[in-house]
Swiss-Prot record:
Keywords, comma-separated and alphabetical: 4Fe-4S, Iron, Iron-sulfur, Lyase, Metal-binding, S-adenosyl-L-methionine, Thiamine biosynthesis, Zinc
Biological classification of the source: Bacteria, Bacillati, Actinomycetota, Actinomycetes, Mycobacteriales
Enzyme class: lyase
Binding positions (Zn(2+)): H378, H442
Positions annotated to bind substrate: N180, M209, Y238, H274, S294, R295, G296, D335, G336, L337, R338, E374, Y401
Cross-referenced Gene3D superfamilies: 6.10.250.620, Radical SAM ThiC family, central domain
Pfam family, one: ThiC-associated
GO molecular function, one term: 4 iron, 4 sulfur cluster binding
Protein name: Phosphomethylpyrimidine synthase
Length: 587
């Protein structure tokens, strides 16, 4: 693997864990010395992948692991159709910016085989992917296997996406975040979407969903998958709808099935399937303030009403399971009836669908197909935990994957914040992955800056939840930052931050000179009123006496604070301080 050279801070470097032939990426942060001695480098999780030419794509990391198991074979695959790239491509007569990199024949399971990580885990097999994840998460490989076998965690790794670096989604592991990208009929291009992918993974996105609904859907996805070191998710109903000229009532199982196989062959790792939207649940949404806000949910609701029957996703769910088991594609069971406003949170429609999703989870597990369950949405803070509890109960602890939730509806332009509040809360309660929200939510398609803001905000929420859960090692990052802050190691503070660029820019707005990077104050308080500098001076001046006094108010009446000797000593030090001019900073 070739490490990337363009690090987000000069103190960062690619420093993989190497063991048993595996090379698991991590970022090492070099730290300056403390007054008391040197600091060990600090290591953090890395999602960005190796530096490559986007026209060539990433190295095929897992290819040999997949073929060595002897349970897959190449085959011709479905015929590529121009409609795969949408109506604009049909009008043009060709797709734009066709992928010209490697195009190996697709793989799928041999007859009678299931090539999912769950199937291997249930058979007692620890795969190379599980070993990779164990090193990445600093846990035992057997623990990874057992969590996947029980359905409490998933490793989304399509056999046709060998470029991906294995990662795990489960509540007993680090909380993960997803970034949504994708074009629309109004804006964006293939180049922009690949750039957004690389930008999102640079800042820490653990998975990326391609939600393209505009031109060149197939080709855009090919470019994204071939350049993605993280799992790629999709909502295949979007592309299927494009194939029937945008008319939901014209969708058929045959069109949808063909679209799913197309995406399986390309290497999509997980797919959002809104199979829990049942005909009987649609009337439950009629009194909502915001109705059905999920695109996929509204498409399937429209289809159910047009045909007055259960959706083809529900009726053909077992067949979908069989297809997914051939490629190791994971279900992301979509919450098509999620609430789009606080007024609709935790209502009958939302929870009826969730209960059905729980039943579908069990059916998928019968085929050894990995599953995660999608959740809301817009939920007041006091109603969030009920979502965790019911998902864990009805979906048997399958990983929960939520969009926020937003905890208030009054802040367009700031919904990355309104949702991060809810995201931290729901992740603390057991949600395994958080789908980011950008400042453009409800307003427009996010650009690169919005993607970065969304990723950083959600990395913050995920980390806060990991700290609150007591996840092993999570607080060490905070402690390293606190130590650097107290010792005025400014460059270390920048390097340890989630977003060094912004931290440096804010610092340098008022103190741009290079000597300010070693000053024992910032522009917030200035040199005279910096609490940490004063605290350091107190330690330097009275360190021995503080140590002798111990903790005031702790212990019995015979404590050092209560003793007459201690009181006399403090009185003497008081007189010395006043006689010396009563200045904290001695000149």
């Amino acid at each position: 693997m070739t490490p990337t050279q363009n690090e987000i801070h000069p103190k960062h470097s690619y420093s993989p864990i190497r063991k048993d032939g595996l090379e698991v990426p991590e970022t090492e942060i070099r730290l300056d010395d403390s007054p008391s001695g040197p600091n060990e480098p600090f290591r953090i999780y890395r999602t960005r992948g190796p530096e490559t030419d986007p026209k060539q794509g990433l190295p095929r990391l897992r290819e040999s692991w997949i073929t060595a198991r002897g349970d897959v074979a190449t085959y011709q695959g479905r015929e590529r159709l121009l409609i795969d790239d949408g109506r604009s491509a049909m009008r043009r007569g060709q797709a734009s910016a066709e992928w010209k990199g490697q195009k190996p024949a697709p793989l799928k399971a041999l007859p009678g085989k299931r090539v999912t990580q769950m199937a291997y885990a249930r058979a007692g097999v620890i795969t190379r992917e599980m070993e990779f994840v164990a090193l990445r998460e600093h846990v035992d490989a057997e623990f990874v296997r057992s969590e996947v076998a029980r359905g409490r965690a998933i490793i989304p790794n399509n056999v046709n996406h060998p470029e991906s670096e294995p990662m795990i989604i489960g509540r007993k592991f680090l909380t993960k975040i997803n970034a949504n990208i994708g074009n629309s009929a109004v804006t964006s291009s293939i180049e922009e979407e690949v750039s957004k992918l690389q930008w999102a993974t640079r800042w820490g996105a653990d998975t990326v969903m391609d939600l393209s609904t505009g031109d060149d859907i197939h080709t855009t996805r090919e470019w994204i998958i071939r350049n993605s070191p993280v799992p790629i998710g999709t909502v295949p109903i979007y592309q299927a709808l494009e194939k029937v000229n945008g008319v939901a009532a014209d969708l058929t199982w045959e069109v949808f099935r063909d679209t799913v196989i197309e995406q399986c062959e390309q290497g999509v790792d997980y797919m959002t399937i809104h199979a829990g939207v049942l005909l009987a649940y649609i009337p439950l949404t009629t009194r909502r303030v915001t109705g059905i806000v999920s695109r996929g949910g509204s498409i399937m609701a429209g289809w159910c009403l047009a045909h007055h029957r259960e959706s083809f996703l529900y009726e053909h769910f077992d067949e979908l399971c069989k297809i997914f088991a051939q490629y190791d594609v994971a279900f992301s069971l979509g919450d098509g009836l999620r609430p789009g406003s606080l007024a609709d949170a935790n209502d009958a429609a939302q929870f009826a669908e969730l209960k059905t999703i729980g039943e579908l989870t069990q059916r998928a597990w019968e085929y050894d197909v990995q599953v995660m369950v999608e959740g809301p949405g817009h939920v007041p803070l006091n109603m969030i935990q009920e979502n965790n509890e019911l998902e864990q109960k009805w979906a048997a602890d399958a990983p929960f994957y939520t969009l926020g939730p937003l905890v208030t509806d009054i802040a367009p332009g700031y919904d990355h914040i309104t949702s991060a509040i809810g995201a931290a809360h729901i992740a603390m309660g057991g949600t395994a992955m958080l789908c980011y929200v950008t400042p453009k939510e409800h307003l427009g398609l996010p650009n690169r800056d919005d993607v970065k803001t969304g990723v950083i905000t959600y990395k913050l929420a995920a980390h806060a939840a990991d700290v609150a859960k007591g996840h092993p090692g999570a607080r060490a990052w905070d402690d390293a930052m606190s130590k650097a802050r107290f010792e005025f190691r400014w460059n270390d503070q920048f390097a340890l931050s989630l977003d060094p660029d912004t931290a440096i820019a804010y610092h340098d707005e008022t103190l741009p000179a290079e000597p300010a990077k070693t000053a024992h104050f910032c522009s917030m308080c200035g040199p005279k009123f910096c609490s940490m500098r004063i605290s350091q001076d107190i330690r330097d001046m009275f360190g021995d006496q503080i140590a002798e006094l111990g903790m005031p108010g702790v212990g019995d009446s015979s404590s050092a604070v209560a003793s007459s000797g201690a009181q006399e000593g403090m009185a003497e030090k008081s007189r010395e301080f006043i006689a010396g001019g009563a200045e904290v900073y001695r000149r």
